[in-house]
UniProtKB/Swiss-Prot annotation:
Signal peptide: none annotated. The keyword Nucleotide-binding applies. This is GTP-dependent dephospho-CoA kinase. Keywords: Coenzyme A biosynthesis, GTP-binding, Kinase, Nucleotide-binding, Transferase. Pathway: Cofactor biosynthesis; coenzyme A biosynthesis. It catalyses: 3'-dephospho-CoA + GTP = GDP + CoA + H(+). Disulfide bonds: none annotated. Belongs to the GTP-dependent DPCK family. One of its GO terms (biological process) is coenzyme A biosynthetic process. Catalyzes the GTP-dependent phosphorylation of the 3'-hydroxyl group of dephosphocoenzyme A to form coenzyme A (CoA). The keyword Metal-binding does not apply.
Amino acid sequence: MSVHIELPRELRPLMKKPLGILYRGKGRDTIEKFAGELSSPTKLISVGDVTTFHLLEAGIIPDICIVDDRTKRKPVSSDVSVRNRDKVYEEVSVDNPAGIITDELIRTLCEAFASEKLLRIFVRGEEDLATLPVILLAPPGSVVLYGQPDEGVVFVEVTEKKKEEIRALFEKLISKNQNNELDKIRRILDGHKDN
């Protein structure tokens, strides 16, 4: 049986705030605003179909991209879907329903960060909340990019301070879920290198 963390209604406003620097705009123009700041991060991770598409179109290849063939809960265009299936990526699929973070997603992310391969994680369900465990699991010096709907792209530099901020948010999520099984997720996040 899968263990998961559900985003409670009262914490949803927290997820609407950018977790890093918001670069406003649309498309490739937005990518060009921060492209110069991507000087060899430890890992580059993109979360979201449109963000991944525009990075690839700009010639920027994330180490890990996390997509679900949807944007704003609607199917992406065939151009976006096809481009995001770039042949440089090995694909891994994972189930993760909307509004939830599953232990399967977290384990898949742990494996992705341990790999040297370029990976496309295809989420059957929704990838929106994947940003949280991505930031926690990414090595310091990594950059996480994700779309802020109708606003632009959020640039998150992974530092120990940022990880502490996200861990505090995770603790709120876990305490709101009040499920002893969630210790399993906490252990994975705390000791992911041993899994």
